[in-house]
């Protein structure tokens, strides 16, 4: 019976670690999800952020004027909007990142994608260590394999609910955030060692 208790406690602590470390990102921050003045705006926005499994992207936009489509790498590169993996039209759109690898998002309204309303990110494992990935929002090299399973299909109301989520943006690399994470990690490891 003690073994079952230890196992359950360990699993609860692992789940708590994933929830604590998950971040919510408001795509574009104050600019939100709109056709940008600078075609590189969303690439610049994503650069320096580390997107992990369990993080959530929130796309805020004016209903009827924008949308969010999850697409393949080829569709991202060419702003092809005919066959998206998923398509959400009702804001806000919340997408939980639940697989590692590259993820691609575009607006399918008019020529918005061609004018820069598109986002490419690379998602790393929840427990991955290290700082922000340089150029996380940069367009991947041609021929790289796209990931098409990084999000859960949209639910009613335009919300996509992949696994693991929350709702505010904390910039990756934020000193206070990193200190809090380090403190939690020490407590977590201490608890696991004490159990076993």
Swiss-Prot record:
Residues 133-173 are annotated as: Disordered. The keyword Transport applies. PROSITE patterns: COPPER_BLUE, PHYTOCYANIN. Residues 1-22 form the signal peptide. A lipid is attached at residue 174 (GPI-anchor amidated asparagine). It is a lipid-anchor; GPI-anchor. Glycans are attached at residue 98. It is found in: Cell membrane. Residues 23-125 form the Phytocyanin domain. This is Blue copper protein. One of its GO terms (biological process) is response to oomycetes. Probably acts as an electron carrier. GO terms for molecular function: electron transfer activity; metal ion binding. Disulfide bonds join 79-113. InterPro entries: BlueCu_1_BS, Cupredoxin, Phytocyanin-like, Phytocyanin_dom. Cu cation binds at residues 66, 107, 112, 117. Residues 175-196 form a propeptide.
């Amino acid at each position: 019976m003690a073994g079952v208790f230890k196992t359950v406690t360990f699993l609860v602590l692992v789940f708590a670690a994933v929830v604590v470390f998950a971040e919510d990102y408001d795509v574009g921050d104050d600019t939100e999800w709109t056709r940008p003045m600078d075609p590189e705006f969303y690439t610049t926005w994503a650069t320096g952020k580390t997107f992990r499994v369990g993080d959530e992207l929130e796309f805020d936009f004016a209903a009827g004027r924008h949308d969010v489509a999850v697409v393949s790498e080829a569709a991202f590169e060419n702003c092809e909007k005919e066959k998206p993996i998923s398509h959400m039209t009702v804001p806000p759109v919340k997408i939980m990142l639940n697989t590692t690898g590259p993820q691609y998002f575009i607006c399918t309204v008019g020529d918005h994608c061609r004018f820069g309303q598109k986002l490419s990110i690379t998602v790393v494992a929840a427990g991955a260590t290290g700082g922000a990935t340089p150029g996380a929002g940069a367009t991947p090299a041609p021929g790289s394999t796209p990931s098409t399973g990084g999000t859960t299909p949209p639910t009613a109301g335009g919300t996509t609910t992949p696994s693991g989520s929350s709702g505010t943006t904390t910039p990756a690399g934020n000193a206070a955030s990193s200190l809090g994470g380090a403190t939690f990690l020490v407590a977590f490891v201490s608890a696991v060692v004490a159990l076993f």
